[in-house]
């Protein structure tokens, strides 16, 4: 019980010896040992004291009233308890009022600097929590800063964490002056702001001595001084000013001395007294540090344009706060910049006297470090006298053999090893390289020091390994050729510009399939869960027995799922940039839908004159895929975040399987591609879990087999060959029906229907004859094993139609419309006449087999004009020109990647043009198309609009990229020639995969851009003109060394 409460008790219930202590100390004049009531106990104001006094009066009973002792005690206790509770309630109410008043006072103070808002005449304040205002948000976006809330900015600028603030302790707003400081931090334009404190404001909970509540009322009265009548008013003012100025000057001198003690750089920096020339005082002040008054060493400039030594200003900022020591303008370490180069040149050209005793040499300030290090070396040499026990003169360390160097440095090596084990965990290499780096810096050999530092940090002084790998791949260098170039460049320049082969192999591992972990949900059926699978044999997993068909082939492939994973990881940046471009959050995990175009094509003769191994067919088949687009399902909408810009480029057509086999060999083709197709079918019903951008994301795949020519479509879909009566792979029309009805057909065939028809063909459930059964199944004669999309391959359509026009030209020259019964010799003569004329007029060289380039040049108005010179009839001229004109209007519709954007008018006119084209064929060229029509003419006239309406394009889904890949295959095979064809195929597959890597393409494009802009390696430092002329990175051919 407190003293106050004990004194307030009535006499009946007070302690019997309560008065004794007071009587005792009065008697002996001894001061009582009771503590004085604290400030908290004195917080009760006068109103409370009056209330307490009144309650005391009510509690005390009059002596005249007679009450029994027991009743008197009970009554006194009840009244005392009731009044005590009332007193406590009043105290609590007062505490609540005090806290409310405290919070109201806090609302008038700045959270950061503690200044009252009343000092600002505009009463401008800003909330501590919540998003920033529009002006600040615009500034942050302009400076590309990520922070968008006040707590982040306050923590960054003032190093104050306001996230844990309590409203009863901390103010909730800050002043406009602090707001200006934040703006100045993120803008380059200086503004006059002043931060009134050197340290952050510390806020305490409310108490009796609360500074927030009592500061305004606690004023210090000025001592009243009698007026001095002896002096006049002016004399008094002058004296006061002199006293103030003297105080300020003394304070400035004191501050400078404190700052000099903080920096303590007199042993490191050069004094201005060492200047060899008697420069003007103002000039000396401009080249000296404002803190230590020495010559500027590693000078830096503040925002307020004062100059300091870097170490001096950083030391002062660390101790005294973020202000300029000269003008106390806010200054942060990040604001320090190097002065202009012309000023540095002036500083380096100053002549100074060497401070070393017995050395009066005058040297330039810029070369003082090297001069001083020479003194230090001489001093060290004087202290160290090498022991030479006679014999031949002592040789320099670098001229010794490696064994002799080890012997001489044996003691030093032992000491370095002991230091490394004691201090650096045994890392001797790091200690030695750091010693070497410091030695280079001390000798001002900064160029070599930068190269060594780059090597220590893993960057290397030359090109990045990925750049070297991109150069090797894009210049078609084999490993041995690259290694020869690497050794030649290193020997000629003396530097390691290119990286060694082992660094390139490390870089390419991350780009090849089988490197990145992934998972399928549910797991793929009949596919291993092992993700570290690289190049595998195309025949692996194929059960063979003695009775099986013998397979004479060499096949190498990637597993389909690992190849897709590697392709997606290679496109990681494109995926994230696409999400950013569509304003999607980068943490969305999908599901992503990936649309894949599949291509397969056979190559002709790929024979080589070298290599050992089994006698395999000298024909090849390539299976490849292209990631066409990636979309994400977000808010019930499918948003496309990636779309291949050049879907027919060989740079995006990734190889999946290479085999030396004939595409006409159905058994071999089925044996090799069946495992691959099984993986494809398994992936259709599963989802891929792959980490993209550090977040696990979900991918689904849609496979579209569109990059097949007609021959291969018929092979894999089980249809009869191209000369069949059933001429179309999209509909069931026969050749006669197609010639009679040239335009009006629709797509009816599908992979599922072909499988059903094969079962009918195999089982013949209706016991029909061969002709009846063939008519029922519409030309299906084998089991389909690859699902293709019923479509037109634009490239082969172009080639097929050009071949047909080539024949029409010959027939028009021979006037077959008059004489249909021409002999074979006459037809051969027409062809020779046409070839000779095209060579002369169009520079078209005759070809045994028409290529895409020949078809493009042939199908032009100029060619028709040239051919018409060989035709006599003007009417035939008009018919032929109109036919070519209609074809050239129809061609862009199926050749363009997006006809709705690239040629919308021709797309609208396609139906009319195709009908007019069909009318010309059936009238003017009836001699050729009566009762028959070519396969591609039928597809061109009948199915193009329907396919475009379904897919949006025909050209984008063509096999042109795969055809370009065929050319690359031949080139890679010549380049990677090895003794074994097995390893040769692996090299070709690996090299071709890396050639299609978007990651390497970015490096190569950046490298070419730098070279084209003139940022090539300096001749004195790198390649330049010192390279032999036969080594050129711009060459497209293999380098012969």
From Swiss-Prot:
Q: Where does Zn(2+) 1 bind?
A: 265, 269, 292, 294
Q: Which Gene3D superfamilies match?
A: 6.10.140.510, Classic Zinc Finger, Zinc/RING finger domain, C3HC4 (zinc finger)
Q: Where along the chain is a divalent metal cation bound?
A: 601, 709, 963
- Where along this sequence does the record place binding of Zn(2+) 2? 289, 292, 309, 312
Q: Which SUPFAM superfamilies match?
A: beta-beta-alpha zinc fingers (SSF57667), RING/U-box (SSF57850)
Reaction catalysed? S-ubiquitinyl-[E2 ubiquitin-conjugating enzyme]-L-cysteine + [acceptor protein]-L-lysine = [E2 ubiquitin-conjugating enzyme]-L-cysteine + N(6)-ubiquitinyl-[acceptor protein]-L-lysine
* Entry keywords, A to Z: Chromatin regulator, DNA recombination, DNA-binding, Endonuclease, Hydrolase, Metal-binding, Multifunctional enzyme, Nuclease, Nucleus, Transferase, Ubl conjugation pathway, Zinc, Zinc-finger
**One Pfam family this chain carries?**
RAG1
- Asked if the record carries the keyword Cytoplasm, the reply is no
Q: What GO annotations for molecular function exist for this entry? A: endonuclease activity; histone binding; metal ion binding; protein homodimerization activity; sequence-specific DNA binding; ubiquitin protein ligase activity; ubiquitin-protein transferase activity; zinc ion binding
The site (Essential for DNA hairpin formation, participates in base-stacking interactions near the cleavage site) lies at 894
Known EC number: 3.1.-.-, 2.3.2.27
Q: Which domain of life is it from?
A: Eukaryota
- InterPro entries on file: RAG1, RAG1_imp-bd, RAG1_Znf, RAG_nonamer-bd_dom, Znf_C2H2_sf, Znf_C3HC4_RING-type, Znf_RING, Znf_RING/FYVE/PHD
Instruction: Please tell me whether the keyword Metal-binding is annotated for this protein.
Output: yes
Where does the UniProt entry say this protein principally localizes? Answer: nucleus
Looking up PANTHER family in the UniProt record yields: V(D)J RECOMBINATION-ACTIVATING PROTEIN 1, VDJ RECOMBINATION ACTIVATING PROTEIN 1 RAG1
Q: What's said on domains? A: The RING-type zinc finger mediates the E3 ubiquitin-protein ligase activity.
- Its recorded name reads V(D)J recombination-activating protein 1
Question: What organism is recorded for this protein?
Answer: Gallus gallus (Chicken)
Lineage start: Eukaryota, Metazoa, Chordata, Craniata, Vertebrata
């Amino acid at each position: 019980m407190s003293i106050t409460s004990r004194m307030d008790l009535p006499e009946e219930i007070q302690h019997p010896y309560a008065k004794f202590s007071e009587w005792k100390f009065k008697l002996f004049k001894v001061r009582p040992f009771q503590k004085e009531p604290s400030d908290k106990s004195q917080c009760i104001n006068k109103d409370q004291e009056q209330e307490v006094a009144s309650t005391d009066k009510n509690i005390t009973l009059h002596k005249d009233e007679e009450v029994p002792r027991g009743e008197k005690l009970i009554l006194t206790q009840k009244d005392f308890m009731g009044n005590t509770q009332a007193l406590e309630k009043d105290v609590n109410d007062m505490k609540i009022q005090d806290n409310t008043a405290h919070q109201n006072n806090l609302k008038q103070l700045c959270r950061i600097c503690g200044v009252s808002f009343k000092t600002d005449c505009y009463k401008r304040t800003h909330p501590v929590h919540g998003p920033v205002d529009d002006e600040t948000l615009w500034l942050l976006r302009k400076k590309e800063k990520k922070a968008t809330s006040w707590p982040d900015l306050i923590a960054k600028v003032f190093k104050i964490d306001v996230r844990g603030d309590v409203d009863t302790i901390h103010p909730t707003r800050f002043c406009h002056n602090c707001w200006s400081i934040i703006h100045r931090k993120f803008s380059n334009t200086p503004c006059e702001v002043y931060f009134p404190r050197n340290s952050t404001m510390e806020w305490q909970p409310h108490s009796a001595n609360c500074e927030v509540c009592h500061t305004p009322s606690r004023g210090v009265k000025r001592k009243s001084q009698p007026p001095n009548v002896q002096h006049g008013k002016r004399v008094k003012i002058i004296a006061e000013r002199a006293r103030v100025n003297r105080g300020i000057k003394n304070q400035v001198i004191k501050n400078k001395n404190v700052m000099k003690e903080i920096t303590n750089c007199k042993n490191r920096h050069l004094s201005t007294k060492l200047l060899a020339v008697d420069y003007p005082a103002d000039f000396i002040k401009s080249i000296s540090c404002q803190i230590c008054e020495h010559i500027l060493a590693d000078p830096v400039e503040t925002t307020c344009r004062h100059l300091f030594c870097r170490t001096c200003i950083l030391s002062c900022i660390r101790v005294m706060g973020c202000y300029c020591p000269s003008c106390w303008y806010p200054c942060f370490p990040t604001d320090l910049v190097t002065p202009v180069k012309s000023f540095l040149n002036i500083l380096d050209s100053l002549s100074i006297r060497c401070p070393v005793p017995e050395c009066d040499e005058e040297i330039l300030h810029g070369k003082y470090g090297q001069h001083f290090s020479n003194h230090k070396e001489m001093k060290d040499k004087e202290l160290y006298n090498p022991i030479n026990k006679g014999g031949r003169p002592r040789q320099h360390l670098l001229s010794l053999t490696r064994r002799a160097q080890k012997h001489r440095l044996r003691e030093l090596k032992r000491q370095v090893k002991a230091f490394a084990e004691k201090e650096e965990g045994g890392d001797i290499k790091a200690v030695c390289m750091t010693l070497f780096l410091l030695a280079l810096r001390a000798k001002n050999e900064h160029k070599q020091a930068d190269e060594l530092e780059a090597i220590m940090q893993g960057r290397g002084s030359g090109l990045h390994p990925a750049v070297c790998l991109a150069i090797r791949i894009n210049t078609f260098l084999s490993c041995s050729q690259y290694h020869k170039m690497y050794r030649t460049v290193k020997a000629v320049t003396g530097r390691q510009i290119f990286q060694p082969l082992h660094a390139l192999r490390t870089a390419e591992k991350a780009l090849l399939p089988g490197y990145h972990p992934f998972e399928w949900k549910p797991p793929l059926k009949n596919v291993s869960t092992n993700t570290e699978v690289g190049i595998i044999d195309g025949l692996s997993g194929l059960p063979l027995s003695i009775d099986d068909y013998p397979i004479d082939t060499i096949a190498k492939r990637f597993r389909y799922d690992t190849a897709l994973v590697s392709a997606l990881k290679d496109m990681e940046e494109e995926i994230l940039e696409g999400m950013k471009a569509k304003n999607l959050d980068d943490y969305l995990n999908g599901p992503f839908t990936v649309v894949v175009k599949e291509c397969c094509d056979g190559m002709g003769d790929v024979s080589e004159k070298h290599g050992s191994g089994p006698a395999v067919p000298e024909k090849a088949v390539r299976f490849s895929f292209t990631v066409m687009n990636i979309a994400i399902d977000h808010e019930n909408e499918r948003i496309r975040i990636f779309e291949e810009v050049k879907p027919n480029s060989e740079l995006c057509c990734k190889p999946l399987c290479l085999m030396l086999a004939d595409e006409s060999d159905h058994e071999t083709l089925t044996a090799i591609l069946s495992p691959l197709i099984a993986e494809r079918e398994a992936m259709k019903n599963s989802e891929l879990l792959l980490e993209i951008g550090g977040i696990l994301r979900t991918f689904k795949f849609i496979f579209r087999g569109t990059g097949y020519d007609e021959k291969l479509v018929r092979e894999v879909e089980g249809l009869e060959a191209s000369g069949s009566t059933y001429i179309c792979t999209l509909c069931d029309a026969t050749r006669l029906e197609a010639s009679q009805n040239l335009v009006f057909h629709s797509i009816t065939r599908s992979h599922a229907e072909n499988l059903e028809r094969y079962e009918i063909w195999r089982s013949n459930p209706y016991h029909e004859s061969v002709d009846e059964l063939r008519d029922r199944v519409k030309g299906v004669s084998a089991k389909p094993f690859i699902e293709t999309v019923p479509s037109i391959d634009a490239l082969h359509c172009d080639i097929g139609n050009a071949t047909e026009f080539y024949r029409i030209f010959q027939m028009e020259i021979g006037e077959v419309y008059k004489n249909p019964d021409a002999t074979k010799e006459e037809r051969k003569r027409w062809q020779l006449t046409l070839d000779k004329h095209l060579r002369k007029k169009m520079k078209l060289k005759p070809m045994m087999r028409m290529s895409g380039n020949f078809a493009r040049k042939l199908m032009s108005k100029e060619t028709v004009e040239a051919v018409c010179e060989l035709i006599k009839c003007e009417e035939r001229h008009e018919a032929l020109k109109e036919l070519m004109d209609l074809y050239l209007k129809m061609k862009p519709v199926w050749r363009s990647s997006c006809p709705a954007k690239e040629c919308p008018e021709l797309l609208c006119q396609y139906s009319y043009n195709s009908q007019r084209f069909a009318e010309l064929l059936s009238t003017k060229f009836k001699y050729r198309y009566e009762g028959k029509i070519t396969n591609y003419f039928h597809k061109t006239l009948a199915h193009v609009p329907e396919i475009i309406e379904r897919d949006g394009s025909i050209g984008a889904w063509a096999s042109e990229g795969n055809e370009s890949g065929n050319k690359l295959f031949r080139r890679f095979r010549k380049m990677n020639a090895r003794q074994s064809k097995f390893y040769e195929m692996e090299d070709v597959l690996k090299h071709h995969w890396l050639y299609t890597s978007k990651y390497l393409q970015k490096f190569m494009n950046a490298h070419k851009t730098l070279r084209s802009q003139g940022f090539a390696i300096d001749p004195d430092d790198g390649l330049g003109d010192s390279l032999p002329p036969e080594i050129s990175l711009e060459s497209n051919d293999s380098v012969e060394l």
